[in-house]
Amino acid sequence: VYKRQDNARTPMQWNHQEHAGFTTGTPWLSVNGNYKEINVENSRKNPDSLFSYYKTLIALRKNNDVLIYGKFQLLDKEHPEIFAYERTLDGKKIVVICNFTDHETQMEATEDLTDGKILIHNQGQNRLGKEKWILGAYEAWMIEIG
């Protein structure tokens, strides 16, 4: 038996106008009450929005051969909380470190990232040192080496 998913959905919140700019008619489902603050139009204007973050990630991937064609290597397969890997190509290296937990965690550094170029990060202060990498809850970094 298939159940409808209407309770899990709301109309797309495009802007601050009536019905969140989704329709000029009456929508089948009600619009979330936060549509005047949380909508696509506002997200596109905000450099700190999730929209802008993903736009930057997509641009990095499109314009960086290391991320497209580079050799992939996990940096610590056994770490229970941090997902860290590197991609290498033609003497260039990009290191990605992600903490998917709701608390601060750390791992032994596989290399010194202090002089690397930060391509993107989502929060916090850089605590990726020579001996250990410390990441806050849900923190992620992408750093270019060389």
Language model features: what each stretch is:
Residues 3-146:
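Carbohydrate-interacting/catalytic domains
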